[in-house]
Amino acid sequence: VVVGGNARQQFHDARGYGRPAGGNEIRLARVEAAHLLLRGDLTAVVDHDGSADRLSFEEFFVASAAAAERFALRFLVYADLRDRGFYLTPARAGWPGAAEADNDLIVPPRGTKPGDDEPAYRIAVVGERESLPADELANLTLAVVDEESEISYLETATPEFDGGTTYSPPAGITGSLIGDRVVVWDAPEEFYDHGFYGQPLEVREAIID
């Protein structure tokens, strides 16, 4: 969405919306334009590629949801973070900040503008029933949107494990593969006590008794 007039000063320079498009014009991503429509900062969006109709917030939102995958979820998170006082930008080519495939929104550090510094948060927007590959989660902040449009933010990181053990399990230990686990019938005590392997069956038996 291209906005003219004094858009660069009013929206980009002062509030971090969009990216410069030459002169005073800026380009807005769909979530940015929808948020400005919702706030009343834009009165309408004109569809020059279609019927040239002036689209209200509702009409633009419905059209964007049909045109862009997961637009509604991304808009909910974008609007929520804006309402919390964050500057942020879509993670897409040409917009401030580094665009990466595994995140949807980029939040710069407080007191800076998008693209000025390394992002403080990389936001991946997901629905609460979506499955996520564990190896793609490190160093992302998940914005999980539930079926009632409530949003939970979950930070992820790559942990560092300190310490170790000098225990080496004895050779020749055998077990039975039962379903998705192995039962070692005659495991030595140090197998669990010092090697921290598995769970002793007698603990479960004591609980049952």
What is the predicted function of each stretch?
Residues 1-79, 83-209:
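Conserved phosphate-interacting/catalytic interface
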